[in-house]
Amino acid sequence: MAAKGGTVKAASGFNAAEDAQTLRKAMKGLGTDEDAIISVLAYRSTAQRQEIRTAYKSTIGRDLLDDLKSELSGNFEQVILGMMTPTVLYDVQELRRAMKGAGTDEGCLIEILASRTPEEIRRINQTYQLQYGRSLEDDIRSDTSFMFQRVLVSLSAGGRDEGNYLDDALVRQDAQDLYEAGEKKWGTDEVKFLTVLCSRNRNHLLHVFDEYKRISQKDIEQSIKSETSGSFEDALLAIVKCMRNKSAYFAERLYKSMKGLGTDDNTLIRVMVSRAEIDMMDIRANFKRLYGKSLYSFIKGDTSGDYRKVLLILCGGDD
């Protein structure tokens, strides 16, 4: 069985004040010692990085984030700043970035809201309100529309049942309702899909997907693809994928961020930073299984310089 869990672990023999001095030295005077910055920050846990930031302020009298911002640039800066941000706040900042200014990064909104646990969603809501003085839901409403808006608002409520409880009658009813809302009739009753996919617990949904296949002879994903479209379709598919296998969902997000011409660096950075301590080993295993190549080799071929160095450390090894 492949190793599970994260690739970034808390460093043993950790000394925040020493790390703070190393970082200051790396940025003081002319030029920047990027390797020294990487050697400290890429090998510490998120919690340890917060301690380093505090030690930096108390022993040097400067803000580490401000110094990093002025010394670094481009994708390397973005990945380092992401690593320096507490987990929930990082999600909150990404959600805000996805909606700020012209255009919307729908993929980012879907990825975060479909993959985080109800508890994480609740913390995201609180932090968003504190950070920006308005609710996440209000921003979603002003930035999106129609069924896509409704599915995001529903996910952002964090109201999914977290139990394991299975009611066979309800499983059959949900599967039948989904069938009747889509495949069985002309036109689609989108609200039914939303209700079932956004509120039921994972165990229940996995049984609903099996029952749905039995009744309709189709995977629920196939039906979603043929019955819905656009960002609403993307959101429903993300929910189903996260329920079936969350690590495989992230492997696909990473694959799509790098395949073909150009790189979607925002997605690549966000997934690598936010999953490094949670399930990067599982993501790697799924990546290899789905695409026949290692995540490591993909990152190596698609990025360069210090940016590549950090991502490869977060990846944690070749498969």
Curated annotation (Swiss-Prot):
Its main location: membrane. GO terms for cellular component: cytoplasm; nucleus; plasma membrane; vesicle membrane; zymogen granule membrane. One of its GO terms (molecular function) is phosphatidylserine binding. The modification Phosphoserine is found at S12. The modification N-acetylalanine is found at A2. Annexin repeats lie at residues 14-85, 86-157, 169-241, 245-316. InterPro entries: Annexin, Annexin_repeat, Annexin_repeat_CS, Annexin_sf, ANX4. It is a peripheral membrane protein. Calcium/phospholipid-binding protein which promotes membrane fusion and is involved in exocytosis. Monomer. This is Annexin A4. The gene is ANXA4.
